[in-house]
Structure formats: structure tokens, C-alpha cells
């Protein structure tokens, strides 16, 4: 909706409606008190900036490898710092809410998420190639819970939710093959969308729309490391609708025989 608001030539009424929608969405995001949503929006904005400024992929790869190396080298110190973090997700203070995302010692929500991730990994080890089948995690993960990972919100029946990760969900339900295919689809989506963005050089309104799609998709697929909602219509419809928009615009652009300098 921010991308639509930035497009030129919109009637005053249309702009007013979009401003109202954006305000509602921003207020909803803030008062959702959902840490994963806050973090994914921030990361998505960074992705948008990297695309906008055409940051070199090799440079990004170098920075990523360097960052991973530094984290590995300082891992013991990082663990000590994390162990001292006692902020809980139940607090209403914004700064403490953010800090609680790194609390892996006492925060029940974080610990339960770790429990679900471990279950997904154990399920993968049981059936590494093809997994347990689509949609089966919720019915199978109970048997793979480690007693040491159980929290106050865990259940012996394993009847409360999913893997809290699209990627680990695919790994446990479809095996290594399924997860690699899912990640390939995600990579293809971003490759196609970013390529489409750079093909539109002069049609600013279209570039703004495509950038909005890039940031929106990035926010979800980053969020997907911590939650999985593609099995619900509320998430699946907008995500795949945006993918369809990218396909449609790409076909339209190719059919017109224009790549750059579109009016």
C-alpha cells in the first residue's frame, strides 16, 4: 500500500484511502506485539534498499561470509550474553519486547519455538529424503519432542500448531528434496522480481509497484524462518497473488519487446 501511495497521478480520494489503510496497517503492526513481524519488516526494508541501490551480489556474499565467521569466532561470548537475557515476550515495553527475541533461556515462546524446530529436525533425520508427507507435522511431531526441550506451553499430544518455520516444515514434511525445491521456488521468485524491477528504467510507477512486491515478499519469506502461514488463506492468497502479478508483468514486458526505457 505504501508503493501504491507513492505512485503519481492518483486522485485525492484514492490517496486519502491509501493513507488511511497505511495508518491502520502501521498501527496494527506496532500493537500486534509480534516480534517476528517487526524484525521481518526491518529486514525487508534493508532488502529493498539493497535492490534500489544495486548493491553488488559478490560484496553481499563477502559481507555475509565475514559476518558468519565473526559470529563463529565469538560464539562463546555471544552465548554468555544470551544467557544473561531475561526479557520476556509478555512485556508491553517496546525495547524489552525486542530484546526478548534473543532470550533463549527463560522465554517460553522462544523455547517452544526451539522445541518445534528440534522436532522438525528429528523428523527429517527419521525420513530424510521424502519426509512424512505434506501437512503431517502437526500430527507427528509429538513423538519427537525431547523432554529437555519441553516448556510450559508444550503438550504431550503435540496438538498445538506447526513447525514455526516454512523451511523446517518443508524439511520435515517433504524431506531434503522438498525443502530444496521450496527454496528453489523462493530463489526463483526473488530472481524474477528483482530482474523485472531493473528492466523497468523509466516507468517509475511500475518500478514503485514492483519494489513494493519485492519488499512485501521479502518480509514474508524472512518471517518464514520463524513462522509458517502458507497453509492459511490469509497468507497464501496475497503471497501467490503477488507472484502471479510478477509473472503477468514479465510476460507483458516480454511481449511488448521492451526491456528498458518503457514509457
Range-by-range predicted roles:
Residues 10-16, 29-32, 161-173, 205-209:
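Membrane-interfacial loop-to-transmembrane-helix junctions in polytopic alpha-helical membrane proteins
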Residues 32-37, 160-165, 226-238:
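Membrane-interface catalytic loops of GT-C/OST-like multi-pass glycosylation enzymes that act
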Residues 42-45, 59, 63, 185, ...:
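Transmembrane alpha-helices of multi-pass inner-membrane enzymes
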Residues 104-118, 122, 126, 130-174:
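Long extracytoplasmic/lumenal interhelical loops at the membrane interface
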Residues 173-198, 243:
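Selective detector of the "anchor" transmembrane alpha-helix that sits immediately C-terminal
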